[in-house]
Amino acid sequence: IGFAQGGTAINEAFASGQLDVAFVGDIPEIIAKSNGLEVELFANLNSEAEMGIVAGKNSGIKKPADLKGKKVVAAYGTVTYVYLNNLLQANGLSLDDVEVINDIANGGTLVASGNADAVVSTGTGVWQMSHSGVGDILTTSQGDADLSSQFFAMGRTNYLKENKVAAEAIIQALQRAKEYITQNPEKAYEALATSDNPKELYENIYPKESGFDNLDPQIKEEQAERMNSLAKFLLENGTISKDIDAKSAINNEYYEEAGKTFTK
């Protein structure tokens, strides 16, 4: 089932009991736990999901520090806003140093028309925009876990308890996928390719030279620490009203059981 509305719609479906398991980003999970939903993370999908920024060709932006005083498109309360904040801080700036335009759906158009100087997007988004002539890739989070987003498998706690085999089957499938792309990267790129997202895109987002440890289904302790930092940022910005402990939202028991079947 696809959710075009993203994390908000997914959390609403969990709350109403219409959804048992979903693949989500780190922000929806934090919001879900802050709102008291009985859900937990049981597998990692991507611990370093790439984010990036495309700068307009006439924006004068050549390095992240040049974003100061510029109009940057990002969506409040999403991974784009978080990435922008973290990138600015890493370069001695803050969100107060830029004018944020909260219109991510039209980000590419705004930059191409000169009504915005830069736009934040996912790795896929920045690649597509740069290749369609919107602008140039300023920077991405590739190779920097602290600037990257995370994606997980999340399920209703009671459903997972009653359907352990389902959770383990998902983890086993994720493990097989990781093993396949590790052993056959070129074939994996070709299998993922579409007319909109060609093989070259996946070669750039998932470079075989970097390895594929970010696709390991086990949720690591450092991932919980990154989520706790993210939760504090979301609390400070009013996205959530109550802080959470990410470690309490993670359940690796299903991974440990599924791991007994993995090829050593």
Label the model's feature ranges.
Residues I1-I101, L110, D117-G123, I137-T140, ...:
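Short, glycine-/small- and polar/acidic-enriched structural segments
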Residues K33, Q89, S130, L235-E236, ...:
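Short polybasic/polar patches that bind polyanions
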Residues I27, D103-T194:
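Pocket-lining segment of extracytoplasmic ligand-binding domains
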Residues F3, G7, A22, G60, ...:
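Solvent-exposed, acidic/flexible segments
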Residues L41-F42, L138, Y189-A191, K242-A246:
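Short, hydrophobic secondary-structure boundary micro-motifs
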